[in-house]
Amino acid sequence: MLDKILSELITLTVDVGEIIMSHRKNSGNFSMKSDNTPVTQADKESNELIMNTLKKLTPKTPILSEESSNIPFSSRKSWDEYWLIDPLDGTRDFIDGSPDFCISIALIRNHYPDFGLIYSPFNKVHYYRLPNQSSIKVAGNKPHKISTKKPNRREKIVVGRYSNNNKPLKNHLRSKTNFETFKLGSALKFCLIAEGIYDYYPKFGRCSEWDTAAGVYILEGAGGTVLDLNNNPLTYNFREDNLSPAFKAAGYQENLKDKSTAAISFVTEPIEI
């Protein structure tokens, strides 16, 4: 099913991206939601187009979106399959004029992602993964497989631009050497690890499930891994609050047992938060 509608989903994200980019000059106009996160007109219009299109493409598949997430757990806990979307991931980055925002669409089956599509409207780049296939990057209409890379001597750790909970990482790396840290918004962090630009991404606070699902599936399809702090894979639609636990994402799995490296150790060693 997904391979048959992939081109339509890619076209959808391009159209949504144009909506988002048309609002960049007015990105400072936003309101705050009940969970104290910002929402813009771009979020709302993007959500409407994605929801309407998915309902036409897959009318029997329910949809859970950041901008329409008030579906009680009692109603959705029986879902075996559903779309999980963030129509504008990185709203704060968008508001602040950063290019680090994206559109994130995942299909969840039996509590795990089974399809992921992320589009960067600013860079006009797609990342996607079909079920049980390798992850693909599309830039300039040219698709190619991507894969994580073995870290160089200076490992590259990427964290959220607005993260206030990096103290555990700083404490953990205090005795380590040969690493650099970078700040980047949205689920694009998963994609850039998937193509070998960064090596690791620790998230020591909880975040919404629509923030992780597509990125997790894409990173895993490029050779990476994402685990919670108990070293278990992330699961979906088990919680009323739709929040993923703290996690750690790594690109190069073959090096997971080498605890001498700076950042890879946080994938294999327990970390107190």
Predicted regions and their residues:
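An extended, acidic
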Residues: 150-273
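Conserved beta-loop-beta connector loops within the AMP-binding
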Residues: 141-153
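Short gly/ser/thr-rich secondary-structure transition/capping motifs
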Residues: 64-68, 140-142, 230-232
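N-terminal subdomain of lithium-sensitive/metallo-dependent phosphomonoesterases centered on the IMPase/IPPase/PAP
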Residues: 1-88, 171-175, 270-273
